[in-house]
């Protein structure tokens, strides 16, 4: 990197450390040319599994980041993974918060429900890779009930997208962990056997187990952002 770029990159870790009181490591730098910003994938020492985006203005060296929303999403993902595990469903999820307000909260120990309420999280998008090649009615029912319960606990609507993977499961999970945004193509190039979608709106699931199984499709790809329309 040239000197100015290096200074910009250094500004990210310095600024984040001052803001959150942790040390941070840049994993990847992007958008070097043609924009006023430099974007980086960053992890913290305290939560190395949470990869998030930070942007620095080349001129002013001002840094913005989405560390806290990724951290809160990670905690929701952990809870979902644990809850599904109780039904012997092995999974890993990527959680995206759709926030109305973006308060500059720096408390990394903040309660999940409180964070969602304060930031006006109406909806949460969940992408889940499931380590299985088929799903029966009981499993589909357990899955829907688990997501429904989580929606009630956090008082928020969910848009849920599931992928059945077998051979590529571990490498897909590693890609999901290393990529901050769900808009990144971490799902590309994997052998997805089936995909399915459902929503939780105001405490009601849009599909029951049978409907979910009937709607499973091996070809229903499409852009990840457009699949719930």
For the regions a protein language model found, what residue spans apply to each?
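A short amphipathic beta-strand at an alpha->beta junction
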Residues: 151-175
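Exposed beta-strand-loop-beta-strand "reactive/processing" segments of non-cytosolic proteins
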Residues: 23-56
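Extracytoplasmic/luminal low-complexity segments enriched in Pro/Gly and acidic/polar residues
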Residues: 170-229
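Extracytoplasmic/periplasmic, Sec-exported soluble proteins
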Residues: 4, 8, 68, 72, ...
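Extended amphipathic alpha-helical interaction segments
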Residues: 100-148, 152, 156-160
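Short, non-transmembrane alpha-helical segments in secretory-pathway proteins
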Residues: 1-27, 76-86, 144
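Surface-exposed beta-loop interaction hotspot
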Residues: 65-125
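A short, surface-exposed beta-strand/turn
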Residues: 50-73
């Amino acid at each position: 990197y040239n000197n100015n770029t290096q200074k910009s990159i250094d500004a990210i870790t310095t600024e984040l450390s001052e803001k959150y009181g942790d040390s941070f490591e840049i994993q990847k730098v992007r958008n070097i040319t043609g924009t006023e910003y430099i974007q980086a994938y960053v992890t913290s020492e305290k939560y190395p599994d949470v990869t998030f985006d930070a942007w620095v203005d080349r001129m002013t060296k001002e840094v913005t980041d989405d560390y806290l929303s990724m951290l809160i999403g990670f905690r929701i993902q952990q809870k979902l993974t644990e809850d599904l595990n109780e039904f012997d469903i092995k999974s890993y999820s990527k959680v995206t918060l759709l926030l109305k307000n973006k308060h500059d909260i720096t408390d990394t120990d903040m309660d999940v429900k409180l964070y969602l309420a304060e930031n006006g999280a109406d909806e949460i998008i969940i992408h889940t890779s499931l380590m299985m090649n088929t799903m029966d009615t009981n499993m589909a029912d357990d899955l829907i009930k688990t997501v429904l319960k989580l929606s009630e606990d956090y008082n928020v609507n969910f848009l849920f997208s599931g992928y059945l993977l077998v051979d590529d499961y571990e490498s897909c999970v590693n890609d999901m962990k290393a990529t901050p945004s769900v808009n990144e193509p971490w799902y590309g190039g994997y052998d997805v056997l089936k995909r399915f979608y459902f929503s939780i709106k105001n405490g009601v699931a849009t599909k029951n187990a049978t409907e979910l199984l009937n709607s499973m499709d091996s070809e229903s790809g499409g852009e990840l952002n457009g699949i719930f329309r």
